Amino acid sequence: METATLVAIPISCLLVSFTGYALYTAFGQPSRELRDPFEEHED
């Protein structure tokens, strides 16, 4: 394989993994533990 391919594949995998983890944190099970600053400061 070429060097560019050997570098691009792991970087792409890391990017996809990070994006998936961010989406899971934002919308999955852990999102219930996140606080909402707008609800804390209702007028």
From Swiss-Prot:
Signal peptide: none annotated. InterPro entries: PSII_PsbN. It holds the Pfam family PsbN. The chain crosses the membrane at residues 5-27. GO terms for cellular component: chloroplast thylakoid membrane. It is found in: Plastid, Chloroplast thylakoid membrane. Disulfide bonds: none annotated. One of its GO terms (biological process) is photosynthesis. It is a single-pass membrane protein. Keywords: Chloroplast, Membrane, Plastid, Thylakoid, Transmembrane, Transmembrane helix. Belongs to the PsbN family. May play a role in photosystem I and II biogenesis. This is Protein PsbN.
